[in-house]
């Protein structure tokens, strides 16, 4: 039995080493956690941060489903680590709650609606926006940073590549230019902005790790969370929009780089294999509807 355990541990370590060599960002200074020694976060809450209806699914599945409508979920996640709280993504702006027309990043394509504000959901577990120490954003599309302004004193974590991109002159087309302009408006000039480069261990113990997954946008990132009972969970951001897209390597037409998008999906597959992780896909409504919702949590 002892020999079997040693062999199993050796297999994990070898596989981890191979993954580190093969991932897009792999280098000697990688911040990916040791799958055996990683610390744990205490709780992971899902918040409902909006829902949307798009009028042409083929934007997300090029060559298929032209003219077919599709509904997406938008999810924020709240992580308790010791006495500190970290929010992952900030969702659709709270102002959308009282607008029957909804809110949009690209009005000709998609409309978002909100059923409950982020502030009200935090209040359900006794928190206020000022209690959130850090806000990490997957990328700067408006449905992910719509409420960053609620957290003026929080540290905002984002990739340097993402920040530089939205402040560059032009994107590849008018739709992307519109998304970039909205991002600059919603993000503003955070008082406490922490720009990072590549994979980053947020708390220094391997419990919460920002994973560089460019392609959807130049500085897109995902999040790897380690919990005591639930194990490793990957929060996708928009590295993938549905299980089908993930299985087939389908790259949405609004992504800024197809090659990077496919490489990032492969990186996520490698992480799933090494950490035996569960992938929560932000916009996949079928999956999201089955997940626990605050005040319930994963631990």
Regions found by a protein language model. Give the residues of each.
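Bacterial N-terminal signal peptides that target proteins for export
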Residues: 1-9
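Metallo-beta-lactamase
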Residues: 7, 20-131, 160-212, 260-276, ...
């Amino acid at each position: 039995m002892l020999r079997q355990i040693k062999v199993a541990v050796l297999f994990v370590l070898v596989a981890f080493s191979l993954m580190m060599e093969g991932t897009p960002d792999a280098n000697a200074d990688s911040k990916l956690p040791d799958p055996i020694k990683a610390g744990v976060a205490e709780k992971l809450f899902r918040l409902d941060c909006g829902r949307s209806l798009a009028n042409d699914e083929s934007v997300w599945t090029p060559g298929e489903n032209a003219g077919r409508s599709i509904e997406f979920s938008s999810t924020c996640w709240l992580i308790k680590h010791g006495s500190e709280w970290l929010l992952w993504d900030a969702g659709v702006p709270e102002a959308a709650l009282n607008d029957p027309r909804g809110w949009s990043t690209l009005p000709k394509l998609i409309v978002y609606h909100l059923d409950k504000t982020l502030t009200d959901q935090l209040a359900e577990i006794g928190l206020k926006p000022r209690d959130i120490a850090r806000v990490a954003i997957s990328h700067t599309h408006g449905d992910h940073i719509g409420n960053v302004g609620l957290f003026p004193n929080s540290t905002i974590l984002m990739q340097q590549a993402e920040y530089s991109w939205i402040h560059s002159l032009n994107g590849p087309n008018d739709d992307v230019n519109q998304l970039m302009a909205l991002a600059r408006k919603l993000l503003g000039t955070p008082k406490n902005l922490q720009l990072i480069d590549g994979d980053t261990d947020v708390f220094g113990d391997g419990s919460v790790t920002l994973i560089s997954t460019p392609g959807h946008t130049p500085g897109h990132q995902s999040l790897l969370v380690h919990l005591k009972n639930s194990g490793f969970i990957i929060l996708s951001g928009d590295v993938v929009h549905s299980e089908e897209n993930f299985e087939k390597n389908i790259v949405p037409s609004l992504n800024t780089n197809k090659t990077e998008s496919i490489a990032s999906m492969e990186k996520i597959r490698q992480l799933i294999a090494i950490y035996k992780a569960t992938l929560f896909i932000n916009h996949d409504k079928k999956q999201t509807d089955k997940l626990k919702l605050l005040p319930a949590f994963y631990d």
